[in-house]
Amino acid sequence: MSLIKAIITPVTPFQQNAPILFCEDTKKCAFVDPGGDLDILLGAAKDNNLIPEKILLTHGHIDHAGGASELASMLSIEIEGPHKEDTFLLDSLESQGNMFGFQARNCIPNRWLQDGDEVTIGNETLQVYFCPGHTPGHIIFFHAESNLAAVGDVLFQGSIGRTALPGGNHQ
């Protein structure tokens, strides 16, 4: 049985985690929520001899999606996720970037995801769960065999993610 492993890499001035998930067998990887600092993410992948396969987005905030379009262009890889309810956020990444001093390009995923979908990394399959609240289109990725989840901002250390942002809902 192969496992999915994670390299946790904090990026952006917000220091949000941008995990690099990879298949132990194939060394193929997915960049999850590449908000920025792409040189750091690419360096971590190279240092671990990983083969970039795709980008996975949990939601459309600047610190999670701000570098996705640029990274996809640089590596000729596709973007999967989030749920289409976050379209308004992905369409405003440039303006979000201007507010926070980030360089960002608006983003259109190659594939929108919804509850029950599956995504692959190498030989492994992860389940997609729709978890709105932090944003209307927030999703998470779960690999049961590895007991590993990439949850974006649904959970913070010691609490739930913020829900008082545009489109958020505490319910």
Can you name each region flagged by the protein language model?
Residues L21, D33, H59, L71, ...:
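Divalent metal-coordination and catalytic microenvironments
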Residues F14, H61-H64, P166:
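Alpha-helix N-cap/loop-to-helix initiation residues
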Residues L3, Q15, R105-C107, L113, ...:
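Residues that act as N-cap/strand-start positions at coil-to-secondary-structure junctions
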Residues A6-P10, F31-V32, I55-T58, Q127-F130:
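Short, flexible loop segments at the rims of nucleotide/cofactor-binding pockets, characterized by
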Residues C29, G36-T120:
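Active-site HxH/HxHxD metal-binding segment of metal-dependent hydrolases
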